[in-house]
Amino acid sequence: MAIEIRLMRNEELGAVESIYAKVFGDQALDYWRRRFEWQFRTNPATLSRPSQLWVGVREETVLGFVASFPARLKVLDTELTVLCPCDLMVSPDARREGLGERLVRAYIKEAGRMAIALTYSPANARLHNRLGYHLVFAEPTFLRPLRGSRVVRTMAKRWFARTSPLNRVLRLSTPVLGGAGEGVIALANTIRSPRAVGNLRVEVDPIFDTGFDQLWREASKEIPVIFARDARMLQWRFREDPITRHTVFAARDSSGVPAGYAVVCESKRHNLRVGKVMDLFCPPSRAKEVVGVLAASFLRYFLSKGIDLITAKGLHPSIRAELRRFMYLKAPGKETPAQFLLSRDDPLADAVYSADKWHLSHSDGDEDFVP
């Protein structure tokens, strides 16, 4: 019997949760339940466009689904409320039937003017290429190790994990590599330490007041393509998140108005404690003044928390260039590509398809929604 693609009915949420648990496990399902109300219903952007969740159904059995939530995107002088897809998954017993592609096509049809994809796997990338998406850029991820010995030992264990006589010998050298790595990284971090200059002061965990609306208005004039970062969106994204605890650093000038901010959180990866710079935002014209002040603050914070490694991703080119002075390593492997489906005849296409026009960060994806 043919599979029907349609919007989820309320009584089918349990079946959707069962598929999620099959793919990611019961613990991840608990996180997904906790963020469902927040991400899909209390999101401020739902005031102008509702979240949507499509299911693939055969004989009343849900076999797969794709969800999407709205987000406000500014492109040049135009603000769009776009649908952002997430959680595309198919039940393991219904794969190789083209269901994933049909679900994405349903999303594209509803998305209208612009469809979005952050493709986290080669299979997803191939699917979106086939559907006509254009690669905008692969978000660069950059790193700063803090506890060199732990980082080097952990990475060495992964590199030498495969069983072979040579790897067994190399594994014995892991403590030596860790000690050497500690010294090299300590020296590099000393050389690449941020120094606060100017008269900016940093406030930790400020209230997102009207000053952040003013910052958004001023900074967004200099950034052609960016998702909304006004006070209400910041409150929802970083204060009301039911899963992740975020810490905010705001740089203020003598008038008290924010000149920029950084948002960070903590996670674990490969037995390492990872500090993530979720966003670092300021007018690009003030990046040289603001980034160093904020970086000095969140580096001290991460050191006090015993973080092993710091990561950041994307950002506007001017902001990224300043941050790269202090986060000097690039992550190995392929980056997560950002892809968009927008007619080349659309007057906004040139801006959307130009990587140097964007400010995109960890916070614009959903990586921290499930720790």
Q: Where are the language model's segments positioned?
A:
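Charge-rich interaction segments
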Residues: 169-222, 232
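Conserved acetyl-CoA-binding loop-helix of GNAT-fold acetyltransferases
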Residues: 90, 95-109, 287-300
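Active-site/acyl-donor-binding loops of N-acyltransferases
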Residues: 114-189, 207-208, 237-240, 247, ...
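Non-catalytic N-terminal targeting/anchoring module and adjacent flexible stem/linker
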Residues: 1-11, 346-347, 370-371
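Secondary-structure boundary elements
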Residues: 109-114, 252, 256
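Hydrophobic, well-ordered secondary-structure scaffolds
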Residues: 83-88, 102-111, 120-127, 145-146
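A conserved beta-strand-loop-helix scaffold within acyl/acetyltransferase catalytic domains
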Residues: 3-89, 202-282
